[in-house]
């Protein structure tokens, strides 16, 4: 009888993460668990981990050797995702958190918080529909971040990024925790697409291409600076028009290809992990980490703008200038700024109203 009791106790301890429980009901207390995971590294939380972006994002972050502890939070289905990913034989320890009542527990002590939470734009849904839902979600999550891990680097993926990053900034300002260096909108997917599409035109490996993409993260606010491509290359006006249009419309291209069954989830997860990995290397102290991101900026007259930034231990260490633009890029930039300004104001007004 004692042997059976011991076996049951061991099974209960091992399976403790499979379903959400109150701390006083759990056989294995949080204080008994490994504090930083199986390896030395950083503590990362994904808010919206059970969604279309969140699941592949969580899987890829579990594979990152710089992550020691991975917290997965969502309002539904977190136990299943946590159980599945926790079976991967990589160093990071995975813990799941389900529902609003466990949000703060998911955030305490985190070094990096990634926010893919929200709904994707679906056929028939207007931008206002998308904004009204996701704005409230981002507001709630950022209020908890301000309370539980105000020093964390925050990567915002939830669309519309042009508005949700200003929303996050206003929430942090109200809480007295705002540090513009630590708040970054993830525009890496635009860079990834630009590298891929340019490589297709040139007939080269996309890993050998680097295209800076500035402005914002929607439609004409996405401005690839093809004149600054590395390695240096010139394009015909027809090629510039084709590449710019395809990069700006990469999202709708995927939505159309999926025939209403989803949006760009896998490529977004890949891009988000690529950017998160850059942030973690910078937190570790690696030098020369430069990526494009949507941040509080003085590059233009707008309060937020996507451009190349140098990352460091505190987040954004330096915002790099735009560099020389050709006539096409200057004209496109002026168009982008008008739309971007309206999106920024919409986000700020959502909090201040």
Swiss-Prot record:
One of its GO terms (cellular component) is glyoxysome. Pfam families: Ldh_1_C, Ldh_1_N. One of its GO terms (molecular function) is L-malate dehydrogenase (NAD+) activity. Residues 1-33 form a transit peptide. It is an enzyme of class 1 (oxidoreductase). It comes from the Eukaryota. Keywords: Glyoxylate bypass, Glyoxysome, NAD, Oxidoreductase, Peroxisome, Transit peptide, Tricarboxylic acid cycle. Substrate binds at residues 121, 127, 159, 193. One of its GO terms (biological process) is tricarboxylic acid cycle. It catalyses: (S)-malate + NAD(+) = oxaloacetate + NADH + H(+). Its EC number is 1.1.1.37. NAD(+) binds at residues 48-54, 74, 134, 157-159, 268. The keyword Transit peptide applies. It is found in: Glyoxysome. The active site is at 217 (proton acceptor). Homodimer. PANTHER family: MALATE AND LACTATE DEHYDROGENASE, MALATE DEHYDROGENASE 1, PEROXISOMAL. Belongs to the LDH/MDH superfamily. MDH type 1 family. This is Malate dehydrogenase, glyoxysomal.
């Amino acid at each position: 009888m004692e042997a059976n009791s011991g076996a049951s106790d061991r099974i209960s301890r091992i399976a403790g993460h499979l379903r959400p429980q109150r701390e006083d009901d759990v056989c294995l207390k949080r204080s008994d668990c490994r504090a930083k995971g199986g390896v030395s590294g950083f503590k990362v939380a994904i808010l919206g981990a059970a969604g279309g972006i969140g699941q592949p994002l969580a899987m890829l972050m579990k594979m990152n050797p710089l992550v020691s502890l991975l917290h997965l939070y969502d309002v539904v289905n977190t136990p299943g995702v946590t159980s599945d990913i926790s079976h991967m034989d990589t160093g990071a320890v995975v813990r799941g958190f389900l529902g609003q009542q466990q949000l703060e527990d998911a955030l305490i002590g985190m070094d990096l918080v990634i926010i893919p939470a929200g709904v994707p734009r679906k056929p028939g849904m207007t931008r206002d529909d998308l904004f009204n839902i996701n704005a409230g979600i981002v507001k709630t999550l950022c209020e908890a971040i301000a309370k539980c891990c105000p020093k964390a680097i925050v990567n915002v993926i939830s669309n519309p990024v042009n508005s949700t990053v200003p929303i996050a900034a206003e929430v942090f300002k109200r809480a007295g925790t705002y540090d513009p260096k630590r708040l970054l909108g993830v525009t890496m997917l635009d860079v990834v697409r630009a590298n891929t599409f340019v490589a297709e035109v040139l007939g080269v490996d996309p890993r050998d291409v680097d295209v800076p993409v500035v402005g914002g993260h929607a439609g004409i606010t996405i401005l690839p600076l093809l004149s600054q491509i590395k390695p240096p290359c010139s394009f015909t006006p027809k090629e510039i028009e084709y590449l710019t249009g395809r990069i700006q419309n990469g999202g709708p291209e995927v939505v159309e290809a999926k025939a209403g069954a989803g949006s760009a989830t896998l490529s977004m997860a890949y891009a988000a992990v690529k950017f998160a990995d850059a942030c973690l290397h910078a937190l570790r102290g690696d030098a020369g980490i430069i990526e494009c991101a949507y941040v509080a900026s003085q590059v233009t007259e707008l309060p937020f703008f996507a451009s190349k930034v140098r990352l460091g231990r505190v987040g954004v260490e330096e915002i790099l200038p735009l560099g020389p633009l050709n006539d096409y890029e200057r004209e496109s930039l002026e168009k982008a700024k008008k739309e971007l300004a309206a999106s920024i104001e919409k986000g700020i007004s959502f909090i201040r109203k």
